[in-house]
Amino acid sequence: GFIGSALIRYLLSDKENIIINVDKISYASNKNSINTEDNKRYTLIEEDINKPNLISETLESYKPNYIIHLAAESHVDRSIDNPDSFIFSNIVGTFNMLQGCYKYWNSLESKELERFKFLYVSTDEVYGSIKNKNLSFTEDSNLKPNSPYAASKASGDLLVRSWGKTYNFPIITTNSS
């Protein structure tokens, strides 16, 4: 998607980063938006995060230090016409990411364990509409989703938060617009 491809281009500008991108390449994806043809530090795995064992196998193969979870169905209007794909991708997919990453994290040795982070990229849509333009949202604002898309992302926010609180899993959530 738009944010993910921009992030990958930015991360590749640092010669130390190695990027493993799991993307099912859907309507929101454009492989040509990332110039990675000859870049040996970039690997694209064209799969859905809901594929059984994909996350665990990928993590064991590549042994990353950080996970940035941007995989999502992301258009509000599409969520109104087809909410089931949003539920499956944004809620079940996030659950699968958490399960696979948590299992991997538990297998790490102490040095890698301390360095590992799971970044979940959400949306400001989870906070609903803001009536006063002088106000803003914070991570402590109440969740008030107004569409199936926003509700599916809010559900993901809560799953990620619960893994952090319940299992001390090292999570970070950002709610971008």
Regions inferred by a protein language model and the residue ranges of each:
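N-terminal Rossmann-like NAD(P)+-binding domain of SDR-like oxidoreductases, especially those catalyzing
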Residues: 1-177
